[in-house]
Amino acid sequence: MQDLNVFKNSYLIIGGPNTKKSEVSRGLSKKLNYKLINLDREKYNYFNDFTDYDEEKYYKLIEIKGKLKALNYIHKYEMKHLNYVIDNINDNSVIDFGNTYLIIDDKNIINKLELFDNIVLLVSNNKYNDEFINKLNRNKLLNELSNIKVNIDNKNVVNIVDEIINYKKFKDIL
């Protein structure tokens, strides 16, 4: 078993739907010259029900398949890829974890997140995030683990990336 907080220099980017996770991950990895690891399921074409990722279709798909079945399907996928990352990671990485909204209640995944020292939680006041924020408030562990919280509303990616880096600098001083 690895020690907790193994990946001290890496950043794990989490957040609800429409929170610019991929853009922020790319921007942060570029600015820090870190390796980018993308776990977004749409990049893997995980759902073969449609070829191009589409938010509306995605949520409809979950409703059609039944929430429990769809979430179980997603958990297996995300655990597989998170385990892969944990087994193969080098330090100095930015990990785009994909849609955290769907795994927020999975204790197996949340416990794995304890390995990361820098967990960046992106939040927004968009309509998709209301339920995510409610779930997050109920999930004390994930709330405590996300030690870098950024509200992305009315900010461009450069501002968000700078805010993340400044959070980290401030945290290191304390």
Enumerate the predicted regions with their spans.
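Conserved phosphate-donor/acceptor-positioning beta-strand/loop module used by diverse small-molecule
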Residues: N111-E131
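ATP-binding Walker
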Residues: T19
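Walker A/P-loop
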Residues: S22
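Small-molecule kinase domains that catalyze NTP-dependent phosphoryl transfer to phosphate-bearing small molecules
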Residues: N129-E163, Y167-L174
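Hydrophobic anchor at the beta1->P-loop junction of P-loop NTPases
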Residues: I13
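ATP-dependent small-molecule kinase phosphotransfer cores
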Residues: E42-I104
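P-loop (Walker A) phosphate-binding loop of NTP-binding proteins
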Residues: G16
